[in-house]
Amino acid sequence: MKTALRCCHDLRRIAVLISLIVPCYNEEASLPFLYEALCDVRKSDTGDRNYEFIFVNDGSRDKTADVIRELAANDKGVKYIFFSRNFGKEAAMYAGMEKAKGDYIAIMDADMQDPPSLIPEMIKDLDSGEYDIVAARRVTRKGEPKIRSWFARRFYKLINRMCDVEIADGARDFRLMKREVVDAILSVNERQRFSKGIFAWVGFRTKWVEHENVERVAGETKWSFWKLFKYAIDGIVAFTIAPLRIATYMGFFFSFAGFAYMLYYFIKAIVLQIWTDDYVRGYPSLLCFILFIGGLILMCLGLIGEYIGRIYIESKGRPIYITSEESKD
């Protein structure tokens, strides 16, 4: 009986497949370096494991597609998905997870800012059975603009105060996950996705692997300050209604303040019968107050619009992405 169980266990080990998902957008210069590093990881694996590399071309305008096709032609372990246009990194990660067949699935950037050298350690941690996810976290932001680093840290503090889930400061999308974790993530089929929040929301036992910030091996970042700002807004709107509550609290506060101000002048004018020319001298302050309240109202309407807009987008039920070409399994 023990021998039979041992044989079954060995068969499960042989069947282990590791899927490495790489979203790509204009990464023709980086892909050869990344592919070489991934091949080194595959060669150095002494366990009974198979690997598949899944490249998701997110509507690149350079020769990224040609590079991927060439890799796939020379390596049966290379799979790919080409989008019909640029749908964004979130859609690319979702598409890669849908295509992945592995028992362990990893997501990593094509620019090698996610060190492939961490993958063997991640595999070892998952093999231990103590964790379901092994995720990478930057402990420094060396090489990153200071203003960008400052806003990033403020964002993590803000969203963690507002949300019920905690998103680690410096957390990357780079992580190795068991199949059941990926299945849980895929069940969250939102159109406007914020994966860092989804990773935290689904839960599971997570180990963090810390590393120093690594600069891009080639090319330029696709994330401008404005794109990061919009991404931050998407994250906040996707995982908390705190902004709406803040707008409600501000409404109560200014309503009370306005009532108190009105009561003050009522008592002064009617009860105490103190008449002055404040109505002339107070005109600038009144105008500033009206402009301030008007701006506050517009801001609150904008917040409401963000949430209603999300409902509208989700209600249309459009696909998260559309493919133009896909490798055969």
List each model region and its residues.
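Acceptor/aglycone-binding surface of glycosyltransferases and processive sugar-polymer synthases
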Residues: 70, 83-85, 89-99, 104, ...
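Residue-level signature of catalytic and energy-coupling elements of molecular machines
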Residues: 20, 38, 96, 111, ...
